[in-house]
Amino acid sequence: EMFPLTLFSLGGMMIFPAADNFVTLFVALEVMSLPLYIMAATARHRRQLSYESALKYFVLGAFSSGFMLMGSAFLFGFANSLRISAVGAAIARGTNMDWMVLIGVFCVMVGLLFKVGAAPFHAWTPDVYTGAPTPVTGFMAAAVKVAAFGAMIRFYTAVAAYLQWDLLYIFAGVAVLTILVGTFAGLVQDNVKRMLAYSSIAHAGFILMGILALQKGGTGHVLFYTLGYGLATVGAFGVVALVRGRDAEGNVLGEAPSLSKWAGIGRTNPWIAGSMLVFLLSFAGIPLTGGFIGKFVVFSDAIKGGVGWLAIVGLVASAITAFYYFRLVRVMF
């Protein structure tokens, strides 16, 4: 059943960032999300943890869908249209019903922020990434996040950008909180999957920073960062799925996400360790990697967009996150 569910979810992901109608946006969100709730509960060796993570994802996902519907209703009441472009045009013309627009945009953005795992809507991310089967986790961490950020960019450029100065500090605060949570919570993790989960939260903050400071051509920069992050994430979780524990007799056991189980992999299996090293270097933004180019263009856009203080926060956090990436490298080698 995994292949049909994956195809349904992929279909929703393709429609989600392309939707120009709030009904289509919501239907695409549900088509994308409902298969994931089932897929998250399919782990065979840790069923209880998998069921718990799937239930948490489902309940919190229902709240995010509710916020998106409520925001769509407010924006429909304001513009008398369900088309996203029509709502943006109505805001550009100006009106006295600013409160409806602000509440509507805020609620829709909350629904999208949940899907990208931004703080304070990130509570599901570490548990779901840990409890779900690792291939499903990689799919969620990469494909879902790319689709959600694509939808957010479309909505922000069409609607929210007209209210940038009204909502800037709220969403800038969300970006800073997301970066800080992903950075400092990841420092204390001894489980590789949870560490990568908090890494994904920190990267969501960096991408949010780029969206808030969109410049001419900046959409391409954000999409490049998102694509580079997605490819590195798929690779990293693919490596996690290959690392297996062994018992005293040398028999191969299930996955071994515990950090202690990765000790010496660089000597016993240098290809796996070398692949993981490349992905971690990209996460850290080391020069000559796609992650470095993505961070460079996004941070440059933030400085040009008048939120240089956000870029400073991002640079400091990026240096701190490198610590737990290189801690894993030290354990492997």
List each model region and its residues.
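Alpha-helical transmembrane segments of multi-pass membrane proteins predominantly involved
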Residues: 1-333
